[in-house]
Amino acid sequence: SLPERSRFNRICNNAFCFLQWIRIGILKQHSNNPKYTIIDSLPLPLCQPIRNKRCKVLTDYADIGYNATKKQYYYGLKGSFEAGSDGHIWAYTFSKASKHDIKMVEDLLRQYRCQYILADQGYLSNELKKKLEKEGIWFWTPSRKNMKEKKQENSKFLKKKRKYIETVFSK
């Protein structure tokens, strides 16, 4: 017989770490450790924008966030992913749509740490960069056009490599 619902939820929560461990083990067997990883997030809308205020699906986990590429608000979740240079997803996490990308980096790094990380402008933070430097992680984000100190790190090569995760998302 099946366990009751609360017991089933506890079993699933306890199994999550074990399943992550198995997933990383399989990835390590079938692909080399990546030289660098790319971090990005994507919106996961649960309803059409017109229904944002009335939606009752997953109210404990979802809320209203802003999709900058479409320039519109959406009700749903946000998925944050860390993909290797070969396109495999090494770490992932889901959060409320309103949670800022910077706050998800630590969750991703708990699952898989890489010495070199590329990210987009949504992860631009001096605090985060300094914190990761202390931990021995090189964290690259392109600088914005209006920034006073434009860094030399804005190379076309790194920007081209960062586009790779967008291709993974579109599959």
Model-assigned labels for residue ranges:
Residues 1-171:
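Short alpha-helical elements
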